[in-house]
Protein backbone atom coordinates (compact mmCIF):
# COMPACT_ATOMS: atom_id res chain seq x y z
CA UNK A 1 0.00 0.00 0.00
CA UNK A 2 1.21 3.47 -0.88
CA UNK A 3 -0.27 6.60 0.68
CA UNK A 4 0.37 9.00 -2.20
CA UNK A 5 -1.05 12.20 -0.70
CA UNK A 6 -2.46 13.38 2.63
CA UNK A 7 -4.25 16.74 2.51
CA UNK A 8 -4.73 16.52 6.30
CA UNK A 9 -4.32 13.99 9.11
CA UNK A 10 -6.56 10.96 8.72
CA UNK A 11 -8.07 11.76 12.13
CA UNK A 12 -9.36 15.06 10.69
CA UNK A 13 -11.31 13.44 7.84
CA UNK A 14 -15.07 13.96 8.15
CA UNK A 15 -18.39 13.43 6.40
CA UNK A 16 -18.32 14.94 2.91
CA UNK A 17 -14.54 14.62 2.44
CA UNK A 18 -13.18 12.36 -0.29
CA UNK A 19 -10.71 9.47 -0.25
CA UNK A 20 -9.31 7.95 -3.45
CA UNK A 21 -8.54 4.23 -3.21
CA UNK A 22 -6.97 2.49 -6.22
CA UNK A 23 -8.14 5.36 -8.46
CA UNK A 24 -11.77 5.23 -7.20
CA UNK A 25 -13.04 8.47 -5.61
CA UNK A 26 -15.15 7.67 -2.54
CA UNK A 27 -17.07 10.03 -0.29
CA UNK A 28 -16.89 9.79 3.50
CA UNK A 29 -20.23 9.11 5.18
CA UNK A 30 -18.92 8.77 8.76
CA UNK A 31 -15.66 8.56 10.74
CA UNK A 32 -15.84 7.20 14.27
CA UNK A 33 -14.27 5.13 17.04
CA UNK A 34 -15.21 1.47 16.53
CA UNK A 35 -13.48 0.10 19.63
CA UNK A 36 -11.68 2.05 22.35
CA UNK A 37 -8.80 0.13 23.88
CA UNK A 38 -6.92 1.81 26.70
CA UNK A 39 -3.79 2.53 24.66
CA UNK A 40 -5.25 2.89 21.15
CA UNK A 41 -8.51 3.26 19.25
CA UNK A 42 -9.77 1.17 16.36
CA UNK A 43 -11.22 3.67 13.89
CA UNK A 44 -13.74 3.19 11.07
CA UNK A 45 -14.24 5.43 8.05
CA UNK A 46 -17.50 4.64 6.24
CA UNK A 47 -17.22 5.37 2.50
CA UNK A 48 -19.56 5.17 -0.49
CA UNK A 49 -19.35 5.46 -4.26
CA UNK A 50 -22.25 7.64 -5.44
CA UNK A 51 -21.87 6.38 -9.02
CA UNK A 52 -22.27 2.68 -8.19
CA UNK A 53 -24.07 2.98 -4.82
CA UNK A 54 -21.48 0.62 -3.24
CA UNK A 55 -20.29 0.88 0.36
CA UNK A 56 -16.74 0.57 1.68
CA UNK A 57 -14.82 0.93 4.94
CA UNK A 58 -11.34 1.95 5.97
CA UNK A 59 -10.24 0.54 9.31
CA UNK A 60 -7.11 1.47 11.24
CA UNK A 61 -5.66 1.80 14.73
CA UNK A 62 -5.05 5.40 15.75
CA UNK A 63 -1.45 4.83 16.84
CA UNK A 64 -0.36 2.59 13.92
CA UNK A 65 -1.90 3.95 10.71
CA UNK A 66 0.73 2.72 8.23
CA UNK A 67 0.77 -0.84 9.62
CA UNK A 68 -2.95 -1.32 10.25
CA UNK A 69 -4.84 0.53 7.48
CA UNK A 70 -7.23 -1.91 5.79
CA UNK A 71 -9.88 -1.45 3.09
CA UNK A 72 -13.16 -3.37 2.95
CA UNK A 73 -15.96 -3.62 0.38
CA UNK A 74 -19.54 -4.50 1.32
CA UNK A 75 -20.58 -7.73 -0.41
CA UNK A 76 -24.19 -8.71 0.29
CA UNK A 77 -24.26 -8.26 4.09
CA UNK A 78 -20.58 -8.73 5.00
CA UNK A 79 -17.56 -6.47 4.50
CA UNK A 80 -14.72 -8.31 2.74
CA UNK A 81 -11.14 -7.10 2.81
CA UNK A 82 -9.83 -5.74 -0.49
CA UNK A 83 -6.27 -4.89 -1.54
CA UNK A 84 -5.08 -1.26 -1.38
CA UNK A 85 -2.51 -0.35 -4.02
CA UNK A 86 -2.71 3.45 -3.69
CA UNK A 87 -4.68 5.70 -1.38
CA UNK A 88 -4.91 9.46 -0.93
CA UNK A 89 -7.05 12.03 0.81
Model-predicted segments: where are they?
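Mixed-charge, low-complexity intrinsically disordered regions
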Residues: 1-89
Amino acid sequence: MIITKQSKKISELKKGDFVTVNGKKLEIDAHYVFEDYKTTKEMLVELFDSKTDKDYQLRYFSDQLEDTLKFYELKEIVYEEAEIDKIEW
